[in-house]
Amino acid sequence: MIIRRALLLCALLFTPVAFSADISGTWKHAQNPAWIEIRLEEGSATVVRNDKYPDRVGRKVLKDLQADKSKQGLWHGLIYAEKLGEYKNVEVSLPEADRMLIKGKVGFMSRTVEWVRVDTIR
């Protein structure tokens, strides 16, 4: 019984850490028909499909992504601001294993967009 409780405690303590440590993979915008692929080893994300704006496929939308050393599940980098035509500061967080929040910042204004992890692009 003690071993079973210890195993359960370990699973509860270490599972969120394992999930929050990896944002690599394919993500779908929660509201729009757009998909990105994050390659954390390259520190970037590229549009792999966008049904509304197909000309954006192949565009690098996130770059210079680096893990926050003081907070697990948080990354900082740059996001491409379409209307400005340049990269701006971004904060990426992983509140759940399959849910990502991307918060772009321009001056004192910010916008957060939710993305959902997917296995395939459909």
Q: What do these predicted regions represent?
A:
Residues 1-7:
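Bacterial N-terminal signal peptides that target proteins for export
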Residues 91-112:
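Short, exposed beta-strand-loop hairpins at the edges of beta-sheets
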